[in-house]
Regions:
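C-terminal amphipathic helix plus adjacent low-complexity
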Residues: 302-346
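Conserved nucleotide-sugar donor-binding subdomain of glycosyltransferases
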Residues: 65-106
Length: 346
């Protein structure tokens, strides 16, 4: 059977979008073409659309339509990016476009007569641009459990959404010989403060502390603290931990739930309150100990003891095994259904 590809657009801010796309593509029997800035030979590499290296989402224009979030004027990268996506659609005639995430790309694909699945992140996304992207999509994919949904999300959006938690690398459920705290810092925010981390480790001498991701070097070395830098396989580090500390991005939350680890969650500020919404849902479910700020060093011994008392059943209820395969199979079903519709109306 000639299967036209599923196009999968990946936003370039942070690492979670790419990790989710890679997991789904690897599990898919239907051909998937990844596209995004920095994709390289793995798919369709798109020109960068950022005004500055330090991207803050602002486009510097005062005449942006309400249906857009980011539409700078006079930017060659945006023009070339749009042309490349439209050209690929015209040439490959994709069965479906998954957009993770960009309201502009979602509307572009829809305007090009392609059915879309929009990846809907958590948070209050009731602004006009998000609602139009949701309305234009044939379906919505939420990479988290429905129990974490904000109460303010419109009912029609919920009905259109397929909740697919567990889109992550398979969890490895084992513990290190010694109690280990793993602190995870992602690419979507500022580097971790090494001195603050060192003080926390010093306050808990019976624990081995380990950090992955970008962290500044502490002023003085601490014997029970190891900074391991960036890793492409965070699930391996998570598997060796007794407790995980980190923010509330979908990628990390999914990986921690997959590994069934006690979680101390410190959400970071993100547009539309994404991480705060997820953290509140985790706290309400009893699946994590949630803090609004990094605590003083003296509080860490008690927090670690408290994390160990969290009930495993609460976090297990928010996870689904084989998430990438379930997501890939669902997308393939949609692609096949849309192809059948086109054949019937041809």
């Amino acid at each position: 059977v000639n299967r036209r590809p599923i196009g999968y657009y990946i936003h370039h801010h942070g690492a979670g979008h790419r990790a989710r796309a890679d997991a789904i593509a690897a599990a898919s029997e239907w051909p998937v073409t990844l596209m995004g800035t920095g994709i390289g030979a793995a798919g369709v590499d798109l020109p960068d659309d950022r005004l500055e290296i330090e991207f803050d989402g602002a486009d510097g224009t005062d005449c942006r339509p309400l249906a857009f979030h980011y539409a700078p004027i006079g930017h060659s990268g945006v023009r070339e990016r749009t042309a490349r996506i439209a050209g690929w659609i015209a040439e490959m005639r994709p069965a479906l476009m998954v957009v993770d995430v960009s309201v502009e790309v979602a509307l572009l694909a829809r305007l090009a007569s392609v059915p879309t699945v929009y990846v809907r992140l958590n948070g209050d996304r009731t602004d006009p641009a998000h609602l139009e992207a949701f309305r234009s999509a044939s379906a919505l994919l939420a990479p988290y459990h429905a129990q974490l949904e904000l109460p303010s999300t419109p009912e029609w959006v919920r009905r259109k959404t397929r909740y697919l938690p567990g889109i992550t690398a398979p969890g490895r459920r084992r513990n290190s010989a010694r109690g280990r705290v793993l602190v995870v810092f992602g690419r979507g925010g500022s580097p971790g403060a090494g001195d603050v981390l060192a003080r926390a480790a010093a306050a808990c001498p019976d624990w081995e502390w380990r950090a992955i991701g970008p962290v500044t070097a502490p002023s003085l070395p601490i014997s029970n603290l190891t900074l391991s830098g960036w890793t492409d396989r965070p699930e391996c580090e998570i598997a060796e931990a007794s407790i995980v500390v980190g923010a509330a991005g979908d990628g990390l939350v999914s990986a921690v739930l997959a590994a069934d680890k006690p979680f101390i969650c410190i959400p970071q500020e993100r547009p539309f309150g994404e991480q705060v919404a997820t953290a509140r849902g985790l706290a309400a479910a009893g699946a994590a100990r949630v803090l609004s700020l990094w605590p003083e060093a003296a509080h860490w011994p008690g927090l670690l003891a408290e994390a160990l008392t969290l009930k495993a059943g609460a976090r297990r209820a928010l996870h689904v095994e084989n998430g990438p395969l379930i997501a890939a199979s669902w997308l393939a079903e949609l692609a096949a259904a849309f192809r059948a519709q086109r054949e019937c109306t041809a």
